[in-house]
From Swiss-Prot:
TPR repeat start and end residues: 56-89
Keyword presence, Cell membrane: no
Sel1-like repeat residues: 90-122, 130-165, 170-203, 204-239, 240-271, 291-326
Pfam families for the chain: Sel1
Entries under InterPro entries matching the protein: LRP2-binding, Sel1-like, TPR-like_helical_dom_sf
Keyword vocabulary terms for this entry: Cytoplasm, Repeat, TPR repeat
Gene from which this protein is expressed: lrp2bp
Compartments, as annotated in UniProt: Cytoplasm
Record function comment: May act as an adapter that regulates LRP2 function.
Protein name: LRP2-binding protein
Gene3D superfamilies per the UniProt record, alphabetical: Tetratricopeptide repeat domain
Domain of life (superkingdom): Eukaryota
Amino acid sequence: MKLRSECLPKSEHGTVLYTLSQLPDFPPCKDQDYSHEDLLQTAETFLKSRIKEGDVQANFLLGQLFFEEGWYEDALLQFEKVKDEDNQALYQAGVMYYDGLGTQEDHRKGVKYMERIVTSDCPSAKHLKYAAAYNLGRAYFEGYGIPHSDKEAERWWLFAADNGNPKASLKAQSVLGMYYSSPPNVDLQKAFLWHSEACGNGSLESQGALGVMYLYGNGIKKNVQAAIECLKEAAERGNVYAQGHLVSCYYQRKLYTKAVELAKKIVSHDNIELLVNTTDCLPSYTVKGVAIATFYFARCLHLGLGIKQDSTAAKQLYSKAAQLDAQVAAELNFDIIYGKI
């Protein structure tokens, strides 16, 4: 299970660029055709003038502006300048070192920066502690920058999840659901509990996972109607894993036209990384969702269900599903052999 870093807790005002543009002393727009690039240039000039005046936070804001634009090398340079005075800069630099954004991966340094935040007594670090604790749990789970330990990962994630506190780490709450669903730590009742907490707090990942748990009766009594409701809502919000299982549900209920229509949309995605970044769902589960949809689309083409029969296209899609996720394709092949699909 490849995890992703917890993002910096977001300002309620949105992006740095938008926040800056609303400040009373931000230079006004003189041209009605003010482009995004023009606004960026104005914001950069504005922040650099603040930096010259000794405004430490302006360094962080400039770094965050660069970070949000994907200019990672420039962002890291700004964060490093003020990491000892600004905990948000320290946090972002830690994420960048761990994930290798704008620099070579340095997991140990990333871990060190997160440890500084969770042990800090500074009031400005308080809102970052849950996110930093999630990232430490991730490091222990992956064994990068620190010795692998499932128990330490679990401990940090439980701290970060804070009993389902909506203001705690949403990623920690969701990943605990995944953690308790996977060997050797399987406890499906705990998994259902944590996915429920995370879903209630807005987790798209956990909403899809809950739908699957209801669908198969994992950790909770099987409830197909509740499963479909969860999967539909998650699918509409962009959860590809939920979309794949929704295709499966449509197929099983003989709603072949619906299955084909949804599967076509999913199979047309040719940029998995973009899907992952857009939804912030785990890469492995996003790929599984595409693989499931691809296999069922192949099955419909193979048998002419909800679409004109096309054995050649079906063969290509069966192969594509196996390339995406061999385990998913193998399990669905067994379902064909045993007459389940």
